Every structure is written in C-alpha cells, then in structure tokens.
Amino acid sequence: MKIGIIAAMEEELVLLVNKLDEPKTENFGQFTYHTGRINGVEVALFLCGIGKVNAAVGATLLLDKFKPDYLINTGVAGAFPGNINIGDIVVSSEVRHYDADATAFDYEMGQIPQMPAAYQADKLLLGLAKKAWINEDSISVHQGPVLSGDSFIHTPQQISQIEQKFPDVMAVEMEGAAIAQTGFLFNVPFILIRSISDKVHEDGSSAIYEQSMEKAAANSVRMVLSMLKEL
C-alpha cells in the first residue's frame, strides 16, 4: 500500500520528512517531493504551497508521479465551534469549497459545476483515524465538515457569511477541497487531518495563528503517524 501525504507549508511536513527511512528528494518546478518509508509503509510527502491552485497542481503531480492508493492532507486550520480548542484535531467527514457559487444554475452553494457538492472522506481512512485518536488520548479529536477557500477567515463579515451558508462547519482552511476534488477526479480516496491553529471568533486570530501554528502542525503529524501505525 502506498500513501500520498500532502501539506501546504514546510512546518506541516518537516516532522514527517524527518521520520523517513530510505529518503529520496526530488523537485518538480517549484514543488518538493520526498519518498521513503515510515513504519514500513511506503509514502510520498509533497509540499504543495498555500491555496487551492497550488494544492490542486501539487496533488496532481503527487498522484501522477507516485500513484498512491490513498491521499492524506495534513496541516492546520481555523476552528468555528467554541468547544474546539487550539491544538485539537479535526478529521474531515466531508470537505467543500466555501468560495464557489454557481447557485444561479441550481448548484448548491460551494459546488463546482459538474462536481460533487461535498467530497466525502474515505471510510477506511476514517476507520484508521478513529483507531489513531484512541491511541492519541492526549489530543482532543473531532470529526465533521471542513471548508476550503483562498482566504484567511478572520473578519466578522467573512465569519457571518460562512456560518449562514454552512451552519455545520467545523473548521476552515485553504487547500483541502482542491486536494479532495483532485483525488475524486483520479479515483483516489482521501482524508483531511487538520489541527487547530486559531479560532475564527477570537480577536487577533492571525496573531494566535502565528503563535500556535508549529504546535498545531506537530499535532496533525502525530495523528498521521498514528494512522500509519494502524496500517
């Protein structure tokens, strides 16, 4: 079994790179790609950059070059519900674009025309995540809908618009839906594992993000490593 793991930022990937046995590194244009084994599992680690276009291009390269059986997106996210705290993990039940609007043509809000409205996380990967969070009892884990778009959500207007359109949202980030859509197009199952770096309703969320990002990224990596141990 081959697992592709993709992240937007070096801080979200470096701890996994450091765990690689028999590591190899390649560059494709401005993208960096590492292969090797973690706990005996063949993996490829891909640094895609921030935002949905970078994520889609990176995921496409990862799928084409490595041909993984499963795709995991690791990284950080902002939390919507007040009971989700900095450093907690959110496992995607589904992921949607929040910044796509083709409702004039009877598509759902967030739905790209001719694509699903929501991309469902793979059941096998969800099962691995559930086993992993039992083992990682020092981290609180939540499962629910995740939204993606090309903005850092922090203003009252942004927050209100998202909550009106997607009242069940648990976390928001900038790459997951593009990665999920790419996986859908290539028939490769996926899951998002995101740790909370900021809470969108708190003042100064960008400063909180800067302070918390490395800790949150490390927690997300811990969860992914626990999942790999379950394979």
Swiss-Prot record:
This protein's pathway: Amino-acid biosynthesis; L-methionine biosynthesis via salvage pathway; S-methyl-5-thio-alpha-D-ribose 1-phosphate from S-methyl-5'-thioadenosine (hydrolase route): step 1/2
Function: Catalyzes the irreversible cleavage of the glycosidic bond in both 5'-methylthioadenosine (MTA) and S-adenosylhomocysteine (SAH/AdoHcy) to adenine and the corresponding thioribose, 5'-methylthioribose and S-ribosylhomocysteine, respectively. Also cleaves 5'-deoxyadenosine, a toxic by-product of radical S-adenosylmethionine (SAM) enzymes, into 5-deoxyribose and adenine.
SS bond list: none
Catalytic site positions: 12 (proton acceptor), 198 (proton donor)
Enzyme class, spelled out: hydrolase
GO (cellular component) term, any one: cytosol
Family in the record: Belongs to the PNP/UDP phosphorylase family. MtnN subfamily.
Catalytic activity: S-adenosyl-L-homocysteine + H2O = S-(5-deoxy-D-ribos-5-yl)-L-homocysteine + adenine; S-methyl-5'-thioadenosine + H2O = 5-(methylsulfanyl)-D-ribose + adenine; 5'-deoxyadenosine + H2O = 5-deoxy-D-ribose + adenine
Originating organism: Maridesulfovibrio salexigens (strain ATCC 14822 / DSM 2638 / NCIMB 8403 / VKM B-1763)
InterPro entries reported in the protein's UniProt record: MTA_SAH_Nsdase (IPR010049), Nucleoside_phosphorylase_d (IPR000845), Nucleoside_phosphorylase_sf (IPR035994)
Species classification: Bacteria, Pseudomonadati, Thermodesulfobacteriota, Desulfovibrionia, Desulfovibrionales
Entries under Gene3D superfamilies matching the protein: Nucleoside phosphorylase domain
This protein's UniProt keywords: Amino-acid biosynthesis, Hydrolase, Methionine biosynthesis
Keyword Zinc attached: no
Residues where substrate binds: 78, 153, 174-175
GO MF annotation, one: methylthioadenosine nucleosidase activity
Gene Ontology terms: biological process: L-methionine salvage from methylthioadenosine; L-methionine salvage from S-adenosylmethionine; nucleoside catabolic process
Name this protein carries in UniProt: 5'-methylthioadenosine/S-adenosylhomocysteine nucleosidase
Enzyme Commission number: 3.2.2.9
Name of encoding gene: mtnN
